[in-house]
């Protein structure tokens, strides 16, 4: 470690401590802040709560400090919202005031300081990007056009699994094949392209770079430099790696996909009537001067981050729960057989005729929420919430997982029981009609990908159950469903081997 750098950092910490104490006293007199644990100068509550602010830890803190509480993470304010009423206030009633996104050193690099749509602040730029992305990605028309591709990809998974002799005996790690399915689902929407197999070199290069991006962005390793800016020089090596990964990914998106699509369409007279894929619409917006080339690449980046992995996690969670709950799996299979018969494979329209399948998907999203704290919100200006003052640029976390797993609001929430959505919770939908259950968020900054995720989940999980008996490996009664979280994600720690026995009647 550079001794001069260390000396400067220590002096900076001392100065920051003095300033923090003074500011804290002034702020306490000026603001009525939400309750929270007493913190230390400079570090705030960071030393007490640690880096991993997972949904369970935050839920436990809410039992002590209430539905709205404040954590000081170094020099950053973090406000945690833990009730349906306060979630409605943040996401709906005051959706404009709390409609921005927080910034940090790593996401600033990966998004070009907010040139994307998902992670940018609430502004005219966000409205423009949302509008440009909606037509080619997030409409019912897209679902009806693309459902045949999703059904085709699910059929290919079934075919590949049946060809693998290990699948029905010792088992396979199904996630690898499902990952290809999700990439193909989204790349067919974006570029009218697909990857032929899990061994495709371009697919593996893309998957590796996206995986590295995910690891770097979701890691807690860089928190100290984000919470305490004076320590940021110690992040130089980390941020250098982030920049390298960002540049390699954007170059890959540009060279292998965007430019290839441009070449393909350059010989044709392109009008909206003959646009074949989403990037055609996006490039048209660029040609009209609405966005620039960087914006185009960050749209591709957003889809890779926000659509592929999150839906994959939910598919994996759903299948894992069905493996570990054979009675539920049998009940779902019986519904499919009864409604569709033996010779008809599930299609997107069929999923709406299968209420138990819909309940299984809802229950998966409730118990195993892929983004349990939603994507963090931020208020650009000073705001009020529940009678408390919320200082400008506070990071707002809505603990959506706790809203959907609080025993005060749900019967036996720790139990995987799809029947709840056919019985006492039959009126609850994933679109946010009940603030106890908001897996995709609500309001202006809700996830528009819900319109794609729900049918893909229904088709994929439905086809797996329709064609196979899903079992744990020989000698095991269940598969491991231990959780692993990142900055705001929740996925399975170990990608388990499962046995898939083909059904003789299908």
Curated annotation (Swiss-Prot):
PROSITE patterns: CYTOCHROME_P450
A Pfam match: p450
Biological process, per Gene Ontology: lignin metabolic process
Main location group: membrane
EC number: 1.14.14.91
Catalytic activity: (E)-cinnamate + reduced [NADPH--hemoprotein reductase] + O2 = (E)-4-coumarate + oxidized [NADPH--hemoprotein reductase] + H2O + H(+)
Membrane topology: Single-pass membrane protein
Segments traversing the membrane: 3-23
Cofactor: heme
Compartments, record wording: Membrane
Record: residues binding heme: 447
Positions bound to (E)-cinnamate: 213-218, 306
Functional pathway: Phenylpropanoid metabolism; trans-4-coumarate biosynthesis; trans-4-coumarate from trans-cinnamate: step 1/1
The protein's enzyme class: oxidoreductase
Entry GO terms, CC: membrane
Family assignment from sequence similarity: Belongs to the cytochrome P450 family.
Stated name of the protein: Trans-cinnamate 4-monooxygenase
Taxonomic lineage: Eukaryota, Viridiplantae, Streptophyta, Embryophyta, Tracheophyta
Gene coding for it: CYP73A2
């Amino acid at each position: 470690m550079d001794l001069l750098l260390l000396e400067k950092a220590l002096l900076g910490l001392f100065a920051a401590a003095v300033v923090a104490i003074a500011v804290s006293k002034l702020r306490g007199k000026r603001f009525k802040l939400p309750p929270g644990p007493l913190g230390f100068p400079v570090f705030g509550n960071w030393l007490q709560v640690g880096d991993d602010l997972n949904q369970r830890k935050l839920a436990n803190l809410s039992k002590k400090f209430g539905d709205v509480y404040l954590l000081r993470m170094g020099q950053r304010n973090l406000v945690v919202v833990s009730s349906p009423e306060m979630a409605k206030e943040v996401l709906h009633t005051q959706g404009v005031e709390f409609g921005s996104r927080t910034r940090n050193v790593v996401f600033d690099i990966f998004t070009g300081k907010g040139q994307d749509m998902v992670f940018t602040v609430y502004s005219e730029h966000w409205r423009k990007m949302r509008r440009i992305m909606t037509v080619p990605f997030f409409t019912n028309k897209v679902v009806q056009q693309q459902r045949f591709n999703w059904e085709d990809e699910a059929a290919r998974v079934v075919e590949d699994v049946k060809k693998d002799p290990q699948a029905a005996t010792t088992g396979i790690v199904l996630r690898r094949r499902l990952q290809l399915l999700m990439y193909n689902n989204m790349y067919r929407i974006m570029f009218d392209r697909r990857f032929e197999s899990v061994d495709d070199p371009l697919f593996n290069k893309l998957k590796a770079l996206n995986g590295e991006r995910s690891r770097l962005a979701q890691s807690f390793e860089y928190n100290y430099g984000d919470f305490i800016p004076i320590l940021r020089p110690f992040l130089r090596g980390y941020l250098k790696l982030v920049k390298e990964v960002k540049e390699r990914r954007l170059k890959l998106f540009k060279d292998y996909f965007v430019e290839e699509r441009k070449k393909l369409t350059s010989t044709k007279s392109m009008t909206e009537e003959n646009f074949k894929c989403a990037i055609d619409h996006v490039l048209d917006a660029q040609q009209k001067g609405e966005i620039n080339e960087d914006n185009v690449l960050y749209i591709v980046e957003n889809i890779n981050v926000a659509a592929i992995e999150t839906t994959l996690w939910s598919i994996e969670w759903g299948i894992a729960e069905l493996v570990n709950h054979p009675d539920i799996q049998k009940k779902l299979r019986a519904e499919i057989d009864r409604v569709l018969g033996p010779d008809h494979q599930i299609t997107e329209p069929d999923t709406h005729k299968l209420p138990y399948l819909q309940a299984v998907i809802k229950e998966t999203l409730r118990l195993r929420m892929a983004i349990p704290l939603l994507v963090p919100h931020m208020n650009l200006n000073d705001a009020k919430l529940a009678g408390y003052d919320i200082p400008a640029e506070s990071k707002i976390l809505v603990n959506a997982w706790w809203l959907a797993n609080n025993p005060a609001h749900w019967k036996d929430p720790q139990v995987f029981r799809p029947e709840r959505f056919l019985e006492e919770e039959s009126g609850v939908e994933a679109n946010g009609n009940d603030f106890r259950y908001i897996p995709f968020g609500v309001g202006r900054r809700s996830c528009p990908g819900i319109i794609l995720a729900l049918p893909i989940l229904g088709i994929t999980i439905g086809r797996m159950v329709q064609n196979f008996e899903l079992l744990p490996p020989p000698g095991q009664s269940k598969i491991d469903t231990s959780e692993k979280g990142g900055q705001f994600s929740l996925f399975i720690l170990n990608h388990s081997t499962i046995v898939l026995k083909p059904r003789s009647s299908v």
